[in-house]
Amino acid sequence: MEQQTSVRVALRLRPLVKKETDLNDTHTLEPHNPPDAPPQVLVNTDKRTYAYDYVFGPQDTNAKLYESAVAPLVRHCFNGYNATVFAYGQTGAGKTYTMGSGAASTEPGATEPGIIPRAVDHLFELLESLDADSEQYALHVSYLEIHNEEVRDLLHPAASSAKTNITIREDAAGDIFVHGVREVAVGSREALLACLEAGCDARTTASTLMNEYSSRSHSLCTIRVQRNSPETASTVFSKLRLVDHAGSARAKTTGTAGQSPTDTATHHQARH
């Protein structure tokens, strides 16, 4: 692989929202990109800097973030490597917007699609470039959420009203897998995006003091790629996992509507 480490961290600074500009708030952190040094952020209060693999400022688009930090992972997944993109941050930080795991981001014509719909387009571009006479491919997608320590299948037809028998297990080789989840075979980007849109609509959301439509669950979208080569009688499997972690903040800060402090505590325990 091009990158030398298995885990890389990107920091994204979102723009100020109207409530913050009305209060004359300013950014505490600023991007700092010195020559011949890793990208950094500058903490204005104490002038300290912290280095990351990628730093994106408030003006940077989803397109720039995707091309810099995510596109290489999708190419590696196409070549047989497993890859995960994990969005983590406080409620209202812009995780769902960045990941594109909100319903609006998966709809056709979305003005600023997030990582998930961009990854779908990119993956199909790569797969469609294969020589159909020498190699075939198959894609399957699953979409889960974890809410209050319950795992829900967002692609289950009755996911919003019925509990599904889903368990997380470990096989003999030490690999973690999810038993009982529905995997949908998809043959086109439109079919895959339709699955994701249905899953987004089923996600658990709630209004908070920090975000009117906050995702109150952790979501995990898994795209399983299978490439078959009849010439060499070989098959390559890989998985692209796209995780939108629900907001990380105290109940007093978020003021989550319809949730008790116990609900919020359980929500945080589900990360582990």
Where are these regions (language model features)?
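P-loop NTPase "switch/coupling" elements that transmit nucleotide state to mechanical/effector output
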Residues: 1-90, 100-272
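Conserved lysine of the Walker
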Residues: 95
